[in-house]
Amino acid sequence: MKKAKLIFKDNTPFSLDFDDFYFNSKDGLNESKFVYTHSFEWKNQENFIIAESGFGIGLNFFLTLKRFLQTTPSKRPKKLFYISIEAFYIEKEQLREIYQKLGFYEEFKELLEQFLKFYPKAKEGIYRFYFEDCFLDLVFEDITILKELDFKADIWYLDGFSPNKNSQMFDENLIFEVARLSKKNTQICTFSSASFLQKNLKKYGFRVEKTKGFRKREMIKAYLENELEFKDKEAYFSRTFSSLKNKKVAIIGAGISSAVLAYELSLRGFEIDVFEKHLELGKGASGNESGILSSLILKPKVNLGEFSELSFIEASRFYRQILDLEFKGVVEFAHNDLMQERFDTQRENVLFKISKNQAFLEEGGVIFPKNLVKNLFEKSKACIYFNHEFQAYKFENECFTLKFKNDIVKSDYAVLIYAMGADTKDFVFYDEMKLSKVRGQVTHLKPFLNTPFPLSSKAYICPVKDDLQVIGASYDRLDASLESKEEDDKQNIENIAEFIDKNTKLEIIGSKVGFRSYSSDRFMIVGNAYDEVFYKEEYKALLWTKNKEQKLAKISCNLYFNFAHGSRGFSTSVLAARYLCALINNEPLYLEKKYIHAIHPARFLIRKLKKGL
């Protein structure tokens, strides 16, 4: 990612990249209020979306958030979503210094320091920050990323530098995407009154009004007169906006994917019931004593690798923001030539500090799954029903009725979510969706290695906790045994041989078996259940029509999937939960389209139809 080159000129941040000031050098604070943050009225609605081209130093955001928080809750939206695109990275300490030099620091200190505490490294991606009733999605990408996003803004801040020095931020391509991501009466706020900007806005259906500017002759405001329709060549992956009879949600399964999802749903005011077949938490793969938070390390530009990196860093930021966890890092080792080749190609990646055959991931570390899952459920205030083994559902009158073993029935749920990990294989029967149930066994040893962070190679070693050290894990697609096996413990020990002296005697004090859920392409499966009959009929000619407009997919009910997280559920569950909440609650979709397509439940069928099979 590009680093911003800036200096102070006339006591104001000045960009050397664009030869322009970041904002008005005489009164930037009041100009931002006049042009952007105080130029519209709040609407008392569920979700209010502000999108911004050019985050800069974040002044517009902090002014907007401050105004939002100071407004009486009954006179503002329930949730504020603020989406801001920024292509030029400013270092954390430099941001703080800018606010101090401008004399803004004390005014924004609390919000700014909360922001800086979780400020990410200089790497492209979408990074979510949690504030009171507000989500900030800071998008570190070029402005062309808009074509990958999906939301309908209420307000646009068209910021950026002067149009004659940064024309890309105001050109026709940008305004096309702005129009696509707007709805009827969406308001455009901008300091500019450039004629070519007015022309582009009018071309895509905006009514343009000239108005008095801040200490100058004029500026413009614009309003979208009618929501535009655009051709969608991949409508089979596009969202269908949900309509809910109530805010009751049922989640089947009580592992990590369920716990994160329950927490995220609780932030949106949903009533959550979780059903678990076991008598307590932690009986499945999410119940290990210790585990590691880490990332796959693949070659650059590999979709699975990039998704794993984003999942990892956002999970780390989530656990730090929500549970106040601290991570000391994790060390990954290249234990064969292929892995070493991957490590060698990632030396410029800021997530990985690579030296020879080692990669240190500063944001990773040891996790304690049982405690983590328990704490998230407690924060969510979800009601957990143990000893409830799910059998079937019935959907009628826009609600689900659930049947459990022993003739237990629960009803009146507007949303049903499958999050039962490896057991999902017994309830999802699409022809093209191939799921694997993979057995894994971890071994509990008496402490034998003093390490402050996990070590991961052929197997992993966790730091000592409560006089116990966890190593693992085995991997077996063919074994369905629930019982621990001596040969698996032996294999786990053999796989950590590189870390211990050959004369070291290890004492096994226990082990635990769990089952992972995998898809055939290693991406998680997250999104709406789909109507297989409709897909096969409507998209049967995709081999010949894949470059033409497609009909929007039919969704028969609010059944959602959240499974196939493999061995990295503590990373991927965070992105999954945010994406599902966006679908259920009609929010900005949060993920880029390339990732939405990669995790979509219908992707296997669509690939087959595109081949004419």
From Swiss-Prot:
InterPro entries on file: FAD-dep_OxRdtase, FAD/NAD-bd_sf, MnmC-like_methylTransf, SAM-dependent_MTases_sf, tRNA_MAMT_biosynth_bifunc_MnmC, tRNA_MNMC2, tRNA_S-uridine_synth_MnmC_C
Cell compartments where the protein resides: Cytoplasm
Disulfide bridge positions per record: none
Assigned GO CC terms: cytoplasm
Region of interest called FAD-dependent cmnm(5)s(2)U34 oxidoreductase, as start-end residue ranges on this chain: 252-613
Documented EC number(s): 2.1.1.61, 1.5.-.-
Pfam assignment, any one: DAO
A biological process from GO: methylation
Reactions catalysed according to its record: 5-aminomethyl-2-thiouridine(34) in tRNA + S-adenosyl-L-methionine = 5-methylaminomethyl-2-thiouridine(34) in tRNA + S-adenosyl-L-homocysteine + H(+)
Domain of life where this protein originates: Bacteria
Keywords: Cytoplasm, FAD, Flavoprotein, Methyltransferase, Multifunctional enzyme, Oxidoreductase, S-adenosyl-L-methionine, Transferase, tRNA processing
GO molecular function: oxidoreductase activity, acting on the CH-NH group of donors; tRNA (5-methylaminomethyl-2-thiouridylate)(34)-methyltransferase activity
Methyltransferase found in the keyword field: yes
UniProt keyword rRNA-binding, yes or no: no
Region (tRNA (mnm(5)s(2)U34)-methyltransferase): 1-225
Cofactor(s) in the UniProt record: FAD
Family membership: In the N-terminal section; belongs to the methyltransferase superfamily. tRNA (mnm(5)s(2)U34)-methyltransferase family.
Protein task: Catalyzes the last two steps in the biosynthesis of 5-methylaminomethyl-2-thiouridine (mnm(5)s(2)U) at the wobble position (U34) in tRNA. Catalyzes the FAD-dependent demodification of cmnm(5)s(2)U34 to nm(5)s(2)U34, followed by the transfer of a methyl group from S-adenosyl-L-methionine to nm(5)s(2)U34, to form mnm(5)s(2)U34.
Name listed for the protein in its UniProt record: tRNA 5-methylaminomethyl-2-thiouridine biosynthesis bifunctional protein MnmC
Native organism: Campylobacter jejuni subsp. jejuni serotype O:6 (strain 81116 / NCTC 11828)
Name of the gene: mnmC
